[in-house]
């Protein structure tokens, strides 16, 4: 069977609104594409959902994800372990180190009942009622830009609706979407006037499991460093300075050398290649030693590595910080989660329509000791009060705090497909993964997974800038030498946490449940064989998620599925063994 290719629409199509050549369907069921209206019409005509309430209707433990309730043991004794991707031995300064959670359902009296009831809803009839033509028209509709090219949310938030205004002061105090998804040849986003927005796209290995397109969504991620890191020492925007600072941050996050375009270190006054002299270099060398600390002035000095431009001065002044495994303060990430599009050839790719627009910002710097103390305090609190839930501060307008220096905020589709702010309870869904597991690097998943110097544009590009998508991208290899996706298949014996992806099972496993060697060998050279769905599966998952959107029941789960999930507990006794023997790994840097 020929495996489906993965394509990504050109930017002009991605953001041009609904396609005019949608194939005809065989029934009359339709979803109307989002009207192409200007922002003022959207503001006056749209019924704005009230999302300001802090009341939690379903679960204060919504930071415990649906995947955590998966059944790991089958009646025949077979054991499945998708848990190790998130709950794993961590690297300092992530002190969570929670590989032991693979081995038991370490819930509390407040979380042992699965609150994600949407998993058990049968949507067979609702999905069957939707034609392919209808869902394609819907996912090709643009719910980010209006017909004039303005960012709809940006226009609305200039005069924030009272239904979205948490403190009812008439001002939006949170993130205002400002990315135009108009990327130059180096992945930098430009606004309509040609100016840099600061956002830069990068390509990466999708995180195992849920975030593979075969399980329902495509996505992209962009990074933006604070303004001081985009400026030269005169305080003027300088793209070359910004590129170097991004490379330095990448080296610190990956703890490895990073290839760059040849530069003259004398221009920047920083020994990037750490050879003791200012000369020409084609790499940022990662070599770290803890800086000195003056207890009298309470300042760090004598760093082993330095930023360039104005950021170097800020670092020396201790207004900007640096450490391995940590981003500088005010680093931002933008993450869109999208539907799957299918072209006339059956190739599956990124749809224009966004399911979610997710935003994260590092609001405060925490030292290694502070992060360690926070982790230890969490452990002590859990031991002393096992049934006490975490207290997550924040609100839907300004975002929710992780407690580790990050703020997360999101926008999600309303019933008609427009993007709206997530409520407090809907945003709780994001917090557990970004602050309570061993897999993250300074609260993030993807930047450590960015493609390296051997990739196109050294990994600095948006998916829409690649004609081949995931085809012929080699499987990531862990720092310990094991193939990462193969390890997932070996440990989980499935292609997703719920073991509902029949396509992956049929392709990679034989009748006895053993991996097929020839398929694994092919996977090593082409990850699209695993992570890209067929046209039929893509359409099915699009329809299933659209039904959830119409219901607006995100607080009960947003996992796209048709039949009720069979391999998930509705409740499980506290500390029940999973039957798993914990998997540990040395994950980064990926090879």
Describe each region flagged by the PLM.
Residues 345-346:
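Extended interaction-bearing regions that mediate binding to partners or small molecules
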Residues 75, 79-84, 88-329, 334-341, ...:
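Extracytoplasmic redox metalloprotein regions
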Residues 2-10:
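Sec-dependent signal peptide recognition
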Residues 21-158, 163-165, 174, 349-591:
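Sequence context surrounding c-type heme c attachment/ligation sites in exported
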Residues 7-8, 19-22:
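Long, low-complexity intrinsically disordered regions enriched in Ser/Thr, Asp/Glu, Pro/Gly
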Residues 15-17:
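C-terminal motif of bacterial Sec signal peptides marking the signal peptidase cleavage site
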